[in-house]
From Swiss-Prot:
Species: Variovorax paradoxus (strain S110)
Name the record gives this protein: 3-aminoacrylate deaminase RutC
Organism ancestry: Bacteria, Pseudomonadati, Pseudomonadota, Betaproteobacteria, Burkholderiales
GO MF annotation: an example: deaminase activity
Protein family membership: Belongs to the RutC family.
Gene (UniProt): rutC
Record keywords, A-Z: Hydrolase
Amino acid sequence: MPKQAIIPAGTTTPIAPFVPGTMADGIVYVSGTLPFDKDNNVVHVGDASAQTRHVLETIQNVIATAGGTMDDVTFNMIMIKDWADYAKVNAVYAEFFPGTKPARYCIQCGLVKPDALVEIASIAHVGNKA
């Protein structure tokens, strides 16, 4: 099964050996996405809502580069640093998935940088649009 790297224009260079997304057989696998700027610094420090929006906009860009939309997302894996931010993360999340919601799981865990409050990885079925 051939796979294609999905790297949107202007994407941050990852700090580890991976790409923002990979597509195989019309399925886009979006890597764990953190609230980073172009220099891999955490943005919106202390604001879980703004960090969630930044992460979901980044994921949206990866999926769009593959020819899809957020409506194509079928599964999300959400990691939050502090369970107290759960409602804030959900409020922003709901804005990006107003129709049929994707399946998902959400866990509390430590993240790669101390100021990061949320990380999301996604799977989207876009077909062969790209």
